[in-house]
Amino acid sequence: MTVNDYEDAKKLFEEVYDNTFVMYHEDSDSFAAEGLAVAMSYKIGGKTAKFKTIQGVKSSNVTLTQVYELHKNSLFTYVEKLGVLQTSEGKMLSGEYIDVVLGEYWIRFRMEERMQRLALTQDKIPYTNRGIGMLVGVAELVLSEAVAMGIVEEGQYRVDYKVREDVDSNEVALRKYNYILWTAMLQGAIHTGQISGILTYDIVNREEA
């Protein structure tokens, strides 16, 4: 959401919410956060919320101190840098990056959707290694799609599971299987960094004779 009064923004400094991000902009007609939400609805989880230009929104009249305070408390604003209008950060009030939260939801909901579709399109998912393999295959498919979305790094995910022989017979009788565990490395994004260099009068690359 967009907060238009800095004092109101300060009241949110102690709040911690995983699913809420707050932008400060003194212009009540800016709707900066709402515009960012629309931009982040495309290629979910695969792009950072920082550095984004929001059409029709002017730079916020904030001081460097205010920007520092906002960022310290996981809020952000809309500024101009190098002549380009852009969001100054991209975090939820919890401190987690917006793209990470969206990526987690994308994987979770897509996994549920694909598992449900599997159950609906098959006569049954047999409680055998073949049936377990069907579930594992769905999990691997969703994670491969998460790679294509830019959420997960290529080659950096795995799906662990128990084979039928290792499952207690009582659970088989209950038709319950809770042994698929996937692990994936977030692709992440670079937001800040330092480039170092040296100017010298010495020859750097000598030509071979």
Which residues does each PLM region occupy?
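Structured, hydrophobic secondary-structure cores that serve as assembly/anchoring elements
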Residues: 90-209
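A glycine- and small-residue-enriched flexible loop/hinge signal that marks low-structured segments
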Residues: 1-121, 142-145, 159-165
